[in-house]
Amino acid sequence: MRQIPLVVVLLLAYAARLQGLISVTNAAVGAKPGPHAGRDLDGSTTSMSVNVDDEERGLSDMLKRLRSMLFDANSATKGQALKKDAKSTKSVKAAGAASNAKKVGQLRHMWNQIKNVEYKGNVKYLAIIYVICILSVLGILGTVFAINRNISNQYIHE
């Protein structure tokens, strides 16, 4: 039972990393100005400005969205909106299919956002490191589970 908070922390860290990558991609697409540096012919820097608001707000926005998804009081209005939809009012089966299609659309949108991240330089190496860390944590948890199960089976047979 002690591993559950660790898994939750790791999942939140992974979500924060993923949200940071997505917010950086969205910031690059938007009209907000990015880092700017002006140089003379001599090579000396004349002016420099950096905008890091999007990266700083990534984790707080993610936590706000998570809180609103978990404790959303507007679930009744969402249900009424599904009932008003012409396709979902035909039958219970159609309502289930409409909500499943909506979920598939959301998953496809998330997958497209992940695919649009450019893995260059440090981002590429960080992604490789995170994958190795996640796989090693899963391996460690699997090993712990196997050891616990083996020990409990030994007590039963004795």
Swiss-Prot record:
Signal sequence coordinates: 1-20
Keywords linked to the UniProt accession: Glycoprotein, Host cell membrane, Host membrane, Membrane, Secreted, Signal, Transmembrane, Transmembrane helix, Virulence
Localization terms from the record: Secreted; Host cell membrane
Location of the motif RxLR-dEER: 39-57
Coiled-coil stretches noted in the UniProt entry, renumbered to this chain: none
CC per GO annotation: extracellular region; host cell plasma membrane; membrane
Region: Host BKI1-binding, residue numbers: 120-158
Membrane topology label: Single-pass type I membrane protein
Induction section of the entry: Expression is induced during infection of host grapevine.
Family: Belongs to the RxLR effector family.
Role played: Secreted effector that suppresses pathogen-associated molecular pattern (PAMP)-triggered immunity (PTI) in host plants. Suppresses both defense-related brassinosteroid (BR) and ERECTA (ER) signaling pathways in planta by interacting with host BRI1 kinase inhibitor 1 (BKI1) at the host plasma membrane, leading to a host dwarf phenotype.
Description of its domains: The RxLR-dEER motif acts to carry the protein into the host cell cytoplasm through binding to cell surface phosphatidylinositol-3-phosphate.
UniProt protein name: Secreted RxLR effector protein 131
Gene: RXLR131
